[in-house]
Amino acid sequence: MNRPRVLLADDNEQLLERVAEHLASSFDVAGIAHDGQDLISKALRLVPDVIVADITMPVLTGIEALRRLQGTGLASRFVFLTVHREDEFLQACFEEGAVGYVVKSHMNPDLIPAIHSALAGKLFVSPCLSTGSSTHAPKSRS
């Protein structure tokens, strides 16, 4: 059985190396992007199963990259790996169709379960986040 393919996107090279190393035992890291435009190009070329991206990147944000990928026919699931804990970022990601939201400081316990959830079509939010009474549901992928 083929291992799921993951595309990583972040402008922090050291973090990308740590994430790739963390995922190597469970997933095939198909590629690495360093900004939002690079993310779009590589996603369309590599067609990964899951994209793990930062929100704050040069050229285009991760949210804008996801927005632009919508409607291209790309079926990749999107998981954000970010420092942002604010509810408005979480909401914006899910409104654009993301299925996962992981806080960078909780990457080790949360990222692999988030990717597995994404592959199963399920929503994942780092448990350290308190979403109050908000309900965050991913956008329909019809």
Where are the regions that the model predicts?
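Conserved sequence signature across two-component system core domains
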Residues: A9-D10, A33, I51
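Acidic di-acidic motifs
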Residues: D10-N12, R85
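Two-component/phosphorelay signaling modules centered on CheY-like receiver
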Residues: E13-G31
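Acidic catalytic/metal-coordinating carboxylates
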Residues: D35-D38, T61-E64
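Active-site beta3 strand of CheY-like receiver
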Residues: L46-V52
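Active-site residues of response regulator receiver
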Residues: D54, T82
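Receiver (REC) domain active-site loop signature in two-component systems and cognate sites
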Residues: M57
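Short, flexible helix-to-coil linker/hinge segments that flank and couple to helix-turn-helix
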Residues: E88-E95, V99-S142
